[in-house]
């Protein structure tokens, strides 16, 4: 029985050492692979200078939006306007309100927002249907992972 315990201890120790040695190599290889698939370029974007009319229109006549950063893992865009209550079954969304104020659906409740509000919308959560009290509303929208073309489900 002692032989099995000693052998097992040596195998565990060897696996630990192999993991310690291999981990930095694997992390470097994975970081390089990711950087090659989604390179980013340094940029500074004046979001406050972008007005509703400057942003491309979308399939929704009340919403204009523009993608700013796109990677394999997430997108960052700016959006202005309103969209009916909906959810994204596969995409988490984070919005940061730059301009405008009002109330919107978030989950099953109407919530007030104003410039400086950070809105966290887990996938599958109903949101939208904004009532604008001061506008237009302009927000940064981060989508994780990038939202697919069929990942919007409109609700009553």
For the regions a language model picked out, list residue spans one by one:
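Short, conserved beta-strand element in jelly-roll/cupin
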Residues: 78-79, 89-106
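Short strand-coil-strand connectors
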Residues: 72, 105-109
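Short histidine-centered beta-strand/loop micro-motifs
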Residues: 84-89, 130-131
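Hydrophobic membrane-insertion alpha-helices, especially the h-region
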Residues: 11-19
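Short, surface-exposed coil-to-beta transition loops
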Residues: 90-92, 115, 125-127
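Short acidic-glycine-tyrosine-enriched beta hairpin
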Residues: 109-124
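Ligand-binding loop in jelly-roll beta-barrel domains
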Residues: 123-150
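A short, N-terminal "cap"/entry segment at the start of jelly-roll beta-barrel domains
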Residues: 3-7, 19, 23-78, 84-85, ...
């Amino acid at each position: 029985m002692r032989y099995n315990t000693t052998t097992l201890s040596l195998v565990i120790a060897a696996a630990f050492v192999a993991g310690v040695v291999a981990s930095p190599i694997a992390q470097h290889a994975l970081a390089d692979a990711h950087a090659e698939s989604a390179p980013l370029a340094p940029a500074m974007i004046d979001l406050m200078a972008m007005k509703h009319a400057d942003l491309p229109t979308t399939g929704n006549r009340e919403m204009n939006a523009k993608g700013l950063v796109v990677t394999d893992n997430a997108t960052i865009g700016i959006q202005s306007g309103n969209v009916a209550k909906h959810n994204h079954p596969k995409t988490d969304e984070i919005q940061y309100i730059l301009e405008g104020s009002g109330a919107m659906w978030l989950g099953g409740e109407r919530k007030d927002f104003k410039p400086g509000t950070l809105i966290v919308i887990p996938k599958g959560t109903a949101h939208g249907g904004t009532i604008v009290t001061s506008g237009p509303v302009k927000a940064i929208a981060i989508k994780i992972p990038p939202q697919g073309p069929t990942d919007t489900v409109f609700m009553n």
